[in-house]
């Protein structure tokens, strides 16, 4: 897919896109990503930006703690003189977890650091016809370790993005996977219908019902609002 954050491997661009893509669809992120970079084209500009500017640029994406942590990460990067180029250093940045650190490390610095999300877990569990619950922490660790050992030297970024693309477009979460188009179909142990039951998911918990009272303060045609910080 032609995605704006794949046109270069600038660490700031990759970090921004990965943070935006958390909890947000790809199509929705495109315009926000371009607008954000137009306003704050460098990590230094992000580090120095006013909070109101950040919140306005993020308006509509939700989960505002993401952009606040993104700025804290930018400030840490500027303070140390540049992006860390190792997995531990990337993980130490505010708001950066294993997936984001893996994406930045492999795409930008050619590190064998897997970026394992739901898409990658689905691809890998189907390849092996694995019937362990996809939510099991041990499964994620096992898959992360197996992928790290398989990363091709000099092509770590390509490998990460290929896995992302495979899970997003070929071996997707909804409906039948496009097995004829899959480049690893010959290795897949779930292609003959077993994919329907893989990945294995735990039983859904019953929804909790809450009853709350909401007070609205009105004076004529105006309503009192309290800004959430």
Positions of predicted regions on the chain:
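N-terminal strand-loop-strand
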Residues: 196-229
């Amino acid at each position: 897919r032609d995605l704006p954050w794949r046109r270069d491997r600038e660490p700031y661009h990759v970090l921004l896109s990965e943070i935006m893509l958390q909890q947000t669809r790809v199509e929705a992120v495109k315009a926000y990503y371009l607008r954000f970079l137009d306003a704050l084209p460098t990590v230094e500009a992000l580090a120095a930006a006013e909070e109101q500017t950040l919140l306005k640029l993020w308006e509509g994406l939700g989960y505002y703690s993401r952009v606040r942590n993104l700025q804290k990460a930018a400030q840490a990067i500027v303070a140390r003189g540049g992006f860390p180029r190792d997995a531990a250093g990337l993980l130490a940045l505010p708001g950066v977890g294993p997936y984001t650190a893996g994406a930045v490390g492999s795409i930008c610095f050619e590190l064998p650091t897997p970026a394992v999300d739901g898409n990658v877990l689905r691809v890998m569990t189907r390849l092996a016809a694995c019937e362990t619950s996809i939510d099991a922490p041990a499964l994620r660790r096992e898959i992360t370790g197996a992928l790290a050992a398989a990363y091709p030297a000099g092509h770590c970024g390509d490998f990460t993005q290929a896995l992302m693309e495979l899970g997003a477009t070929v071996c997707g979460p909804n409906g039948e996977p496009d097995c004829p188009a899959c480049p690893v179909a010959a290795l897949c142990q779930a292609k003959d219908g077993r994919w329907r039951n893989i990945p294995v998911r735990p039983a859904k918990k019953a929804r909790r019902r809450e009853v709350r009272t909401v007070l609205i303060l009105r004076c004529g045609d105006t309503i009192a609002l309290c800004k959430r910080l």
